[in-house]
């Protein structure tokens, strides 16, 4: 199978961001037009992705896509790709056979987020401290969501190259006196505290319950939405502390990723949680934790951080790649199927 990103895809191209709960699609009719957003699909409403695409997209449009470029949350190995947090198993060969497609590429969901930060529009990001972006320097994107997604973006050979990985599973340990009070009450995974155990939707509840337990109080808020809403309104003291600590711990992990990639091109926070708690991220705690990386604090103060506020950032990244794949070093070997 080809692995060169300069090989184009036949238009029209269906691009999709397939998450654990929702699947979002857009149609790109040519290399110059804007992608046409389609109604989001709940993955639980359909038995297979083929059924979802046929009934929700193909049956409702006169445009027949010739290609599909999909970003999925799950390991891409072989001809069957199970989603990490949903029941769908993506079988590209079946998509070619049943949906009239000629070309299918499957990439990691945070590769798509990384593609989106190559050239974000000013209106799609909000800067949270630091200096100016250094053009063509490495970048990092982190996204607390169902889990904690992390990817790098490096520039080499005249191309932006996304670097996916499992950075959300790095260790996250206590540092302050308050951390040491809270940590015994956090739920670990197989005996260790990974970043994803705190820095995601369920992680907010993990942290909230631990804060309440450390205070000797009952955890009265039922879900992540209640915690974040109560924190932003100031209605619940434990929720306020939870979101403040969440911002601190996200700053620590984001700072670690910035050091790993020497991300002078910027560190970007993606996803719905980052957008919702943006007021908390704009407070000093996030940047203070991000910059607290002795002996490199002076360097860290120069690295800009941003919240991505584009509602469909992954789709914008996929669209940029679909238009001009030669501008990106996306590995295709073992991930592209054609007939």
From Swiss-Prot:
Gene Ontology molecular function, alphabetical: ATP binding; D-glucose binding; glucokinase activity
Residue numbers binding ATP: 16-21
Pfam families: Glucokinase
EC number: 2.7.1.2
Disulfide cysteine pairs (residue numbers): none
Superkingdom of origin: Bacteria
Reactions it catalyzes: D-glucose + ATP = D-glucose 6-phosphate + ADP + H(+)
Gene Ontology biological process: glycolytic process
Localization per record: Cytoplasm
Claim: Nucleotide-binding is one of the keywords in the record: yes
Keywords on record: ATP-binding, Cytoplasm, Glycolysis, Kinase, Nucleotide-binding, Transferase
Record-level GO cellular component terms: cytosol
HAMAP family: Glucokinase
Listed NCBIfam families: glk, PRK00292.1-4
Family membership noted in the UniProt record: Belongs to the bacterial glucokinase family.
Annotated protein name in UniProt: Glucokinase
Organism field: Sinorhizobium medicae (strain WSM419)
